[in-house]
Amino acid sequence: MQRAAVLVRRGSCPRASGPWGRSHSSAAAEASAALKVRPERSPRDRILTLESMNPQVKAVEYAVRGPIVLKAGEIEMELQRGIKKPFTEVIRANIGDAHAMGQQPITFLRQVMALCTYPNLLNSPSFPEDAKKRARRILQACGGNSLGSYSASQGVNCIREDVAAFITRRDGVPADPDNIYLTTGASDGISTILKLLVSGGGKSRTGVMIPIPQYPLYSAVISELDAVQVNYYLDEENCWALNVDELRRALRQAKDHCDPKVLCIINPGNPTGQVQSRKCIEDVIHFAWEEKLFLLADEVYQDNVYSPDCRFHSFKKVLYQMGHEYSSNVELASFHSTSKGYMGECGYRGGYMEVINLHPEIKGQLVKLLSVRLCPPVSGQAAMDIVVNPPEPGEESFEQFSREKEFVLGNLAKKAKLTEDLFNQVPGIQCNPLQGAMYAFPRILIPAKAVEAAQSHKMAPDMFYCMKLLEETGICVVPGSGFGQREGTYHFRMTILPPVDKLKTVLHKVKDFHLKFLEQYS
């Protein structure tokens, strides 16, 4: 026994013998020979390939971060390596990322976030008492008094209460915290609700009505879920208005090949910047009630209204003002976010959705679905709390907060008018009034020769235009084909977020490029 133990410890076992045994050296030699004979795997033998992957994922497209943006990244790297270009920097006007464009954070929000992240600062005299009060309330509702803990899947309870109070103040209509779900940005809420709504196959597949032009999140999620995209076109000749007759046309035609169940509205519009009138919202709600459609109201730009003739009206408010027949029957989910407005806190990924008239059993299914991802980031939830619960009159931080808010929104209003005016001075560019949101979506003339050149490069004409704009000026914008547009029309989306001086530079560069482009291809 002792000798066997020593042999085991030394790793030298006695040779196996008999009809069932072979020496280890013999077995090793055979194994080595087998490995040599076995063919090496080639890439075609991989389990996950473009042919075997989920076809719905492969069908997803997201133009806001598509080929133009990838090319912009390549050009930035070339500039860093010292490769000469006709410009010295890439200006990323493709996305509504306020802080990346130089907008300064709102002081109060960052103070509360600092206190929540490092609670020892609660003892510092450098922070105002109203910021400390909010931070303490948030932390006391978190497990272990820490943002680093999980929250309930629906979100931190006191923050849901603050969201409900915000909606009540905004609309003059009571909001129930039990109908509030905190999300990882508004996008998370939109995709979650669509997951609940999509079902069926063949002609019974769920149809989702979306505006054209649209925010590409919608087409991407619809593709991912294997639903049917049902396009309704906004009226460009009437400042991108939503026409109920167009909704009826789209619905009628869609019923031949799918089961339309969902109507998505973006107000204020992205990429089109229109603000819907109260009458228009009433008409849409009546249409949804009449046709038994579930309403999705994307209202993340509700603070971004610049035209003095326009005012934001929430779908929730108008729904309740239309009376009990509507308010007790129309199913509605509305969405808001930390990313837009005047806060512009995109990176925190904070958001919420409010659901109205959702069946109790479906609410249970919603909580189950949300539980799979545990909870949205608690730091993003805290940021959402400051969006809906900012300083009030009489509080220490109110004056500074009001100055900063008015500065951001006032600047955006000036830049919206500047962009509209300058674009409309350029032959071959038409830009509707930028009533809200933070983008221009001008219509551009692309000559027939340029269309032919684009086709020879296997590009959409506006992709060809935007790629040349990037390569010749360093300005990164998104082609209108990524958002959808009427056949034969071409557009691009550009954010108005850069500082005024840089925005003027961008606009003049676009003007010079466009005139040169027209001359080259006419």
From Swiss-Prot:
Listed cofactors: pyridoxal 5'-phosphate
N6-(pyridoxal phosphate)lysine modifications at: K340
Pfam family, one: Aminotran_1_2
Catalysed reactions, as listed in the record: L-alanine + 2-oxoglutarate = pyruvate + L-glutamate
Swiss-Prot/TrEMBL keywords: Acetylation, Aminotransferase, Pyridoxal phosphate, Transferase
Pathway of action: Amino-acid degradation; L-alanine degradation via transaminase pathway; pyruvate from L-alanine: step 1/1
Lineage: superkingdom: Eukaryota
Enzyme Commission code(s) on record: 2.6.1.2
Tissue localization of expression: Specifically induced in fatty liver. Highly expressed in muscle, liver and white adipose tissue. Moderately expressed in brain and kidney and expressed at low levels in the heart.
GO cellular component labels: mitochondrion
GO terms, biological process: 2-oxoglutarate metabolic process; biosynthetic process; L-alanine catabolic process; L-alanine metabolic process
GO molecular function, one term: pyridoxal phosphate binding
Residues with N6-acetyllysine modification: K414, K504, K511
Family named by the database record: Belongs to the class-I pyridoxal-phosphate-dependent aminotransferase family. Alanine aminotransferase subfamily.
Protein role: Catalyzes the reversible transamination between alanine and 2-oxoglutarate to form pyruvate and glutamate.
The protein's assembly and partners: Homodimer.
Miscellaneous comment text of the record: May be responsible for increased ALT activity in hepatic steatosis.
Protein name as it appears in the record: Alanine aminotransferase 2
Biological source species: Mus musculus (Mouse)
Gene: Gpt2
